[in-house]
Design a protein with these regions (language model features):
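Short-chain dehydrogenase/reductase
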Residues: 104, 153-161, 197, 201-205, ...
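N-terminal Rossmann-like NAD(P)+-binding domain of SDR-like oxidoreductases, especially those catalyzing
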Residues: 1-190, 339
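Glycine-rich, flexible loop/turn motifs
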Residues: 46, 93, 137-139, 143-145, ...
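Short capping/connector residues at structural and topological boundaries
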Residues: 98, 139-140, 146-148, 161, ...
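Short, flexible active-site loop motifs that bind/organize anionic cofactors or intermediates
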Residues: 13, 61, 86, 93, ...
Length: 351
């Protein structure tokens, strides 16, 4: 974009995994960024490190979206906000099955509060962090944006679907609104500096942090859930995408959310599926170690394969994933060895 004066972006959940990498990319592209986060999934340390990497000072507020007055205070303090990128959410699929009401309260009601605050302050443009889980079990592969949605297998996925529906309804009744929904597949990796990465609280929800924790000795073995799927090696296949490609997808979506109105949806994926064993092999190559794993029974709810059709984002946003699985594993290992305790110091105490 040729704009001299960049927009000011409010990023909710900007201290989290995807949020922090997107904040870096926004700042590098010349945008002004304001972050709100309640630090349930993210760490204040990630904001400090973003400031170190980018040389920027980031206004950051400890705000829970369930407290609408706190959101309104941020909009009042920063009347220059013109676009919102909304990451803030609870994100553990397994936990959502155990605590569905918590996920609906935080992910859905929190978003309603945010939308109402936007309406009260005349902000009408938002990019929403959604998920490929809204597609449920694949009816066909690769999955494009016309694949049926709503047949979700977890309250987490339902909460993302519900928010998509709410945003669609807003666009229907408010013609000036512009919404871009980005459905991510499986984000992996870390910033090339090794200063920012995924820091799961407790037991990781995703495969790759588990693999890296086994490699560095924090865990003794990786459990592989099933090797009898109808895939090339019997293990589950997913579309893994580098976190930096995901972040760049938000930059690509910026012109669309600025220059048009209405409700638009895009997949962010590579279009290439990798199995659990493929990931293990690539990570062994990155770290130079053997990964100790053990095959156990399938998990309830897991599907054999998921893979994106990313052509719409390529055509309409000019965005395409550029990193491969080896790149993802290399950058993840770089983050892991530099930060064996995540954002905590070596004594395990928080800053």
């Amino acid at each position: 974009m040729a704009d001299v004066q960049r927009d000011t972006i409010l990023v909710t959940g900007g201290a989290g995994y995807v949020g922090s990498h997107t904040v870096i990319t926004l700042l590098e592209d010349g945008y002004k960024v304001i972050v709100v986060d309640n630090f349930s999934n993210g760490s204040p340390e990630s904001i400090k490190r973003i400031e170190t990497v980018t040389g920027s000072v980031i206004p950051c507020y400890n705000v829970d979206l369930l407290n609408k007055n706190d959101i309104l205070d941020v909009f009042k303090k920063h009347k220059e906000i013109s676009i919102v990128i909304h990451f803030a959410a609870l994100k553990a699929v397994g936990e959502s099955v155990e605590k569905p009401l918590l996920y609906y309260r935080v992910n859905v009601m929190g978003t309603v509060n945010l939308i109402e605050a936007m309406c009260e302050n005349g902000v009408t443009r938002i990019i929403f962090s959604s998920s490929a889980t809204v597609y449920g079990d694949p009816k066909y592969l690769p999955m494009d944006e016309n694949h049926p949605v709503g047949n979700c297998t977890s309250p987490y996925a339902k909460s993302k679907h519900f928010v998509e529906e709410i945003l669609s309804d807003i666009c229907r009744i408010k013609s000036e609104w512009s919404v871009v929904v980005l459905r991510y597949f499986n984000p992996v990796g870390a910033h090339s500096s090794g200063m920012i990465g995924e820091d799961p609280q407790g037991i990781p929800n995703n495969l790759t942090p588990f693999v890296s924790q086994v490699a560095i000795g924090k865990r003794t073995e990786l459990l592989v859930f099933g090797d009898d799927y109808n895939t090339h090696d019997g293990t589950g296949v997913r579309d893994y995408i580098h976190i930096t490609d995901i972040a760049k997808g938000h930059i690509a979506a910026m012109s669309k959310v600025k220059d048009s109105t209405g409700f638009k949806v895009y997949n962010l994926g590579t279009g290439k599926g990798s199995s659990v064993l493929d990931v293990i092999t690539a990570f062994e190559k990155a770290c130079g170690k053997k990964i100790n794993y053990r095959v156990v029974d399938r998990r309830d709810g897991d599907v054999a394969a998921m893979c994106a059709d990313p052509k719409k984002a390529e055509t309409e946003l000019g965005w395409k994933a550029t990193y491969n699985l080896d790149d993802m594993c290399r950058d993840l290992w770089n983050w892991q060895i530099k930060n064996p305790n995540g954002f905590k110091p070596k004594n395990g105490l928080k800053h």
